[in-house]
Amino acid sequence: MARLTKVYNTDDDDSGYVGRRNLPLVAGDKLMMLMDLNSKGLVIDSPLIRGRELEEFSRKFKLLTEAERRQSLEIDSASFMEVLNQCVQCVGCRRRVERLFHQLTETGHRTLDPLELRPTATLGIVEEKLKTPQALGTLLYRHHEVLNNLLDNKLRNKTRCVLHSLDAFRAKPFSETWREVWSAMKSNCRNELTIIETKELHDVLENYLKKHKFCSGCRTKIERAYKILIGEISSKEKGYAAQLYAHIRKCVPDQHIHVTTNKIEFLDALIKRAEPEVNGSYSKLRERHAKTLEIAQEEVLTCVGMIMYERLRRIYVSLREEERACQVLAAVGVHALCRSFDTFVEQKQGISNLELLYQEISRAERAKQIKREQKKLKKKKKKDEKKNLLHRQCDDTEANESDEEEEELRNEELDLEEESQMQHEELSDPGADDGIVIEAARSPEPEPELTSKPTKSKPKKQSKKKKQKKAAFTKMGNQKQMQATARVQPLDADHDQLDVASCISSSIAKTVGDKCEECLASMPNCPCEQDVRDSGYGSDPPSHAGSRTSSAISSPEGSEVSCSDGLCNHDVHDEDSDDLLFYSHQSQLDHKFSLLQMWDDFDEYDDKDEETYYIPQEVVMAFKCHREQVQRKREELRAKLRANFERLCVQHGVQTQVQKSKRTTSALVGQ
């Protein structure tokens, strides 16, 4: 806040008081104070420009001659008012700036130095600022930003500023802000402000008594307290409180009183006592009383506080308004002068600032576009390098996997060759056919596949690997079959070796005349044979409980097993039954020949009866018979389960859906 440095009356000539950046301020009816803006400064004050800003303004400064510069930096009142109406939205600020403009034009005060308002109603710049480009450029530097920052304190959704809004004093009471204006005043201003004329105090007291309708007795006490204050009556009255008037000094010859300025607490108490009266907070409580002289003294102090409140508030509002008006006038004036200067520069250089700005923006955009393209190319190059690196890694992975697959296949072939050599050695052994059973060689366990990174060519590699493995196993099977054939042929050609097939067929042909291997009885009288031929449903004979053949219970299942094993005596013996009997006897010989020989015999049997794979009719009929029995038993079990469930529900008191439906049906029938 600006300082109040001097106080004088309105009748005095202020030409000798008002200096640079000083402005007279109305403080009362006949009281004037001098506002000093040197301590606060104006918004147009800024540090000297240097560097690029100075070079740019120097170029514009040199384009114009001295006469053109003078002409460009001088505007009339009409141009100023037009710019003012465009920039300032608050009506109160505009009216105050207009009054200040005309006031400074008439008086010629240098309040806005280096701006000057001439008697011709024109706004210009002092001669010193026009000589150097640095001084002039500093004054015109960032004028638009300065104006926007100054006018940016208006309320939201309102055109008035905070100072000229109706809510300016409602938000914060003056009793909390009066210290600001009190601290901005010098001692001479404070002393002059605290002088109260007795006539003024008496008028305020009369209005106060009429407002609150004091009774005659109370009015008398208040008037006596007033006369004691101004010194008309002696203070030796009954009930007088001297401490209430302790900080008020009376001047009887001059007919005024002085409020002590060094007692801030006393002033604060006076203002807080008077604030409800000034704001109208006690308007509903109009009737007041002063029963004692002490209460009457307090009522007189309330009137003194009302006078001080009005004076301080008037100075506070005037000081803030004049200070803001000076700031706005200076900012708008610099803005208007700068616009006029730029117009002359554009006319001289033949191109407007807007076009220059467009060219500068275009250059910046082109630079950004080039930078984006370079960044895009760099990113694309980096992406291509990454892609090539991935391709190389994939190729290396494929090569490694192919090498691993080849090595794995090579190992499998070596294992197969070793197994074939072992089988060849076993078959070439002369005692290999003397009832010794050759166990099947264990198939080589497949080695776990080597894990590799998932690539797009993995399905192709897997299919290729499967084909190679399949070809290898096919080749191995063909080699084994060829080796087995080559080994069986010497056995058939050699008459000294035992032919297993001929032995089996000769033993089948002599089954009637031979003896039973179990009980050593003749075959027609063999009880084992009779048990086998028995296809009834009797129990197992106890006399042959230890027999292996009669250990199976004579039942339909046992009969079917015996029939499937070729042990049944059918009337018609076809080739199929002979073959089944052949293989059943072959299984009873405890496998006294090699696996390769059994495989060759099965291949010959499969070649002869290639089209005999079908389900016999007896098996189909037995399945149907069992199916009907199973279905019937299932229905019986379901009915039994349902009956048990309903019985349990009845026992536990639970009503089932069937019982509900039965009750509903019975109810409908009853109706």
Swiss-Prot record:
InterPro entries linked to this entry: GGNBP2 (IPR026073)
Bias (Basic and acidic residues) ranges: 385-395
Biased composition range(s): Polar residues: 476-486, 546-557
Gene Ontology cellular-component annotations: cytoplasm; nucleus
Ranges where the record places region Disordered: 372-489, 532-562
Biased segments, Acidic residues type: 396-420
Annotated Basic residues bias: 373-384, 455-472
Organism domain of life: Eukaryota
Designated name of the protein: Gametogenetin-binding protein 2-like
Organism, scientific name: Drosophila melanogaster
Lineage per the UniProt record: Eukaryota, Metazoa, Ecdysozoa, Arthropoda, Hexapoda
